[in-house]
Amino acid sequence: MKPWIAGLDHGLSTVDIYSKECIGMFCIIPTLYYGLLAFYKTLGWWDGRRTKYGTPIRNMVAYEFAFGIPCCWFSYHGICLWLGWNEATDLYTEPLVSDRYYGQSDYVVRNLLWPMFIYQIWNTIYSVFLIKDLCRAEMYGHHIVTAFVQYLGLNGFMNYHAYFFIGLVEISNVFLTIVDIPRFVPEFSGNWPILHKTSQLGFITSFILLRMILWPCIAVPVIRDLIFMLRDSTAHSESVVSLFILATLALTYLQFKWGWKIAQMGWQIVTGKSIEQAKDHDKKQ
């Protein structure tokens, strides 16, 4: 194998593709989605109600749970790797200890990379064909770029850092599943006020901590090291490293774009005023 193609030769063998984790993620998302749709329809929930983009409300709620529940999987395995729980000690053993960029972890590939790859493919399909509210360029870009990053890691590239970028950061999406529901079902927050407020607090806190504070603290040194690899000609594949840098920059931009909106939401919850209202008040003082 020539070094310059090593980063793209991922060996997508039947053993990898047909792992139980990969099959599980492939099956669980549509099963949850259509199972919940059937359940809601049987109970007559949200009959005839649609979003402003024309998506049936029950489809939106089914989507939120079908894609929110798998985030518990990613979060759990990220925590296990971080803390070394349940024999998930790959971060503290070879080969990841001595090679954080090209050491391969079967645990990471099985439990994070393959499932996330499938998750993002499904997310792209649902966004394009089923959920009109998600037909936005930034959503397509996020799903496709994230799936591509998983693909690059299948043969041992950046497996070490997956515990954070694929695992821990998904904690915020677990809370987001509940936070998003009142956008389509306004009465939810009134019927379940404690659950909604707790989820809001958990989402805002985890997003700011994980995606706006810790993300750049980890991403910046990674990008620096990858640039040094390109400079020193030690990258296995210059094209892969370059593409990964661009993908990371794009995803980082999205974290801060969304993070600013979330920080505004947090400010309004705490103060009861939007940032614009606070600025107007200060000007009047």
Model-assigned labels for residue ranges:
Residues 168-179:
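Alpha-helical transmembrane segments and their membrane-interface exit regions
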